[in-house]
Each structure stands twice: as structure tokens, then as C-alpha cells.
A protein has these predicted regions:
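Conserved alpha-helical substructure of the radical SAM core
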Residues: 1-117, 121-122
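Short loop/turn microsegments at loop-to-beta-strand junctions
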Residues: 13, 279-281
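Short cysteine clusters
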Residues: 22, 26-29, 273, 279, ...
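Short glycine-enriched, charge-decorated loop/helix-capping segments at active-site entrances
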Residues: 40-45, 139-147, 355-356
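Conserved AdoMet/S-adenosylmethionine-binding subsite of the radical SAM
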Residues: 55-56, 78-197, 204-206
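Radical SAM enzyme [4Fe-4S]-AdoMet core and its adjacent flexible, acidic
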Residues: 141-151, 158, 162-274, 278, ...
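Flexible mid-to-C-terminal extensions adjoining Fe-S/redox cofactors in radical SAM and related proteins
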Residues: 298-363
Length: 363
């Protein structure tokens, strides 16, 4: 018997089929160091048994007729194409008339004709990580040998366009490219990207015993990684691009943050958890079946359990996860809750970790 999610919104769990394994070593990547949590496990790849178990349970837990699978990394394309073909076979096996959609995030460097044929044929949406023009992108996005990745990413994007694959850009805003908002924005228009997600990089330093350096909420430290964008930079970056976009590009180019802000303004669901009053509806499952509260909270204290010992419903509608979601608002300082702009930004104290005065509010 299927156990259904008790609320109307879909159960959403991001999959990490290779964990933190990646062919790049981007300086600011928050996920690379997660491999230290699994240093005793020799192979960081999702096996067929776990893949089938997750797909069956994930589909059977849904109340909606449309079901979205999201594949994330690490670098997702380090799993062979056969793995994703197998995933689609299993999705159809357990779909029982429901519509299945897939989206996949990639750094773009491993895309080939064969990959793009598959993505187009099966209508997969692709997210490509690219940080603007070459001089910005290559500053932090390099491979393990220190070589730049921009040229390979652009070759991948060319292939996506060649085969007509739908794709959007996930662009990290850091201490370097934040000072050039129009150059950054115009680059995406020049390469034909109409859907853009801007993500500010804000990482605090906390030295863990196992070698991890990034802090989570509750690990009180004001020290930031050097690549972190400042509040002033982030504010100027958004305002400058917004002025350009609202005067020239509305309806032609779509910027996720602006769409979400408008949704908040008119009382609609913003569609992204970072812009919601509460969160906790989007978890993540690692390559071995471990489940965490959020993709940005893969820390031991935010582990909900393992799919082999607990159901997805038990984990995501249990007290621990519900409290996690409510704390996004509860932990805000009074100054943020009383701010006239709160409705617009729904500041994400959970993500930045600045619980005394949120980082966003300073910009």
C-alpha cells in the first residue's frame, strides 16, 4: 500500500547519484567537501537496488499527477548514460499513469552528442553551471589540475543548442563577477540563455575535525571565505540588472529571483524554498540512501535517516524536518521580521547562517 504525502504540495527529493564526486574542483563549491562524510565508503555511486527502491517509493508517495525527478551532483554526467536510461525504465515501470519529468544539473564539460540526443529525445531539462564571461568563470571554476573549464562548458552549451535541448543557467555570484553586473547579464543574453538563476556565494569558515571547512547554522563564526560576495555587492548587482531587465527584457528573459520576488509581492508561492517564509519541502538523498533536510544542509546534524530504514514520508513529515522548515522564520531577528522589505526577500537565514542579523539585510 502506498503511503501518501499528507499535504497538497509534492514531496520533493533531489538525487545525488555520484554524491560529491566531480571532474571539477571549483574553489567555492559547498558540496565537494561532503565526500569527507563518506570517506570510509569506497565507491560513491548509487547502485541499481537503491535506484529502484527510491523511484518506486518516491512515485508512490506523491499526491500529484505530475512527478519531477531532479538529478544533481557532484557532476551527474560522471554516471554513464546507461544509468539514466535505467532510471527512465524504472520510472515507467512504477508511473501507473502519472506524468514523469526529469531535470539534471551539470557543469557542462562532459556533454557529448550522445548525451544531447538522449536529453532531447526524452525531454529532460538541463541546468548548466556557468559564471558569466570567461574571465569570471575561469577564476573559480577549474578542474583538479587547475586548468580552466570555460571552453569545455561552451562546447557543451553549443551541443545543447545544436540538438534543441531546453536548458537554463545556474550562475554563482561571487566577489569578482558581482562588480560587473551588466557584463555578466549581457553575456547570458549573447549566448542565447533565456532562463537564469543567480546564486550568491556566502560561505562561513568553521574548521571541523574531519577537515571540512564550511559552517552550518549554529556554528557561530563571522569569518567568510574569500570568494563570498558582500551584501553591498549583491544589492548593487541585483538592482543594476533589474533596471536593465525591467526596461528592456521583461517577457524575453526570465530571472528566477525576480519572478519569485514578484510572486511574493502578489501573495503567490515563489516556487523556490529560499524565498518562502518557511522551507523544508525540498530534501536530498545521497548515493547510499542517506537523506538530509536540504541540499545545502548535508551535515550530520541534519541527517533525517536512510531510505532503507525509514520511509520518505516518515522523514519529510516527521517532527525534525517540520521544525527545520519552521526555523527559517522563527530564527530571524526581530529587525528582519519587522522590516518593510521582508515580504519581498523572505531572507534565508537558514542558508547564510547569520542568525543574529541576516546577511541579505545588510545589502
Amino acid at each position: 500500500m502506498a503511503i501518501f504525502a499528507p499535504f497538497a504540495h509534492p514531496l520533493y527529493v533531489m538525487l545525488k547519484p555520484v554524491g560529491a564526486v566531480c571532474n571539477l574542483a571549483c574553489s567555492y563549491c559547498y558540496y565537494l567537501e561532503k565526500s569527507k562524510l563518506y570517506k570510509d565508503e569506497p565507491k560513491h555511486v548509487m547502485n541499481d537496488k537503491l535506484l529502484e527502491k527510491f523511484i518506486e517509493e518516491y512515485i508512490n508517495s506523491q499526491t500529484m499527477p505530475q512527478i519531477l525527478f531532479t538529478w544533481h551532483g557532484g557532476e551527474t554526467l560522471m554516471r554513464p548514460l546507461a544509468f539514466y536510461k535505467r532510471a527512465m525504465e524504472l520510472q515507467q515501470k512504477y508511473a501507473h499513469g502519472r506524468t514523469i519529468s526529469n531535470c539534471i544539473q551539470t557543469n557542462g564539460t562532459l556533454l557529448t552528442d550522445e548525451w544531447c540526443e538522449f536529453l532531447k529525445k526524452n525531454d529532460w531539462l538541463v541546468g548548466v553551471s556557468i559564471d558569466g564571461p570567461q574571465e569570471f568563470h575561469d577564476r573559480y571554476r577549474r578542474n583538479k589540475q587547475g586548468q580552466p573549464s570555460f571552453v569545455k562548458v561552451m562546447k557543451g552549451i553549443h551541443l545543447l543548442n545544436k540538438y534543441g535541448v531546453d536548458w537554463n543557467a545556474m550562475a554563482v555570484v561571487n566577489n569578482l563577477n558581482a562588480d560587473y553586473p551588466l557584463e555578466f547579464y549581457n553575456f547570458f543574453k549573447e549566448i542565447g540563455c533565456r532562463y537564469i538563476q543567480f546564486t550568491p556565494i556566502v560561505e562561513r569558515i568553521f574548521r571541523h575535525n574531519d577537515g571540512r571547512l564550511l559552517a552550518t547554522i549554529g556554528e557561530d563564526t563571522p569569518e567568510l571565505m574569500e570568494f563570498s560576495v558582500t551584501p553591498e555587492q549583491w544589492g548593487n548587482f541585483l538592482c543594476t540588472i533589474f533596471e536593465e531587465w525591467v526596461h528592456n527584457d521583461v517577457g524575453e528573459y526570465y530571472i528566477q529571483l525576480f519572478d519569485a520576488t514578484l510572486a511574493n509581492w502578489v501573495g503567490e508561492n515563489p516556487g523556490i524554498c529560499t524565498m518562502g517564509k518557511t522551507c523544508g519541502h525540498a530534501g536530498v538523498m545521497e548515493f547510499n540512501g542517506d537523506v538530509y533536510s536540504c541540499d545545502h544542509f548535508v551535515f550530520p546534524q541534519y541527517k533525517l535517516g536512510n531510505i532503507y530504514s525509514k520511509t520518505l514520508i516518515e522523514m519529510f513529515y516527521g517532527e525534525k524536518q517540520l521544525e527545520f522548515g519552521q526555523n527559517k522564520y522563527r530564527s530571524l531577528p526581530r529587525q528582519c521580521k519587522n522590516c518593510k522589505s521582508y515580504l519581498l526577500v523572505m531572507v534565508n537565514v537558514q542558508r547564510t547562517g547569520f542568525v543574529k542579523l541576516n546577511w541579505v539585510s545588510l545589502g
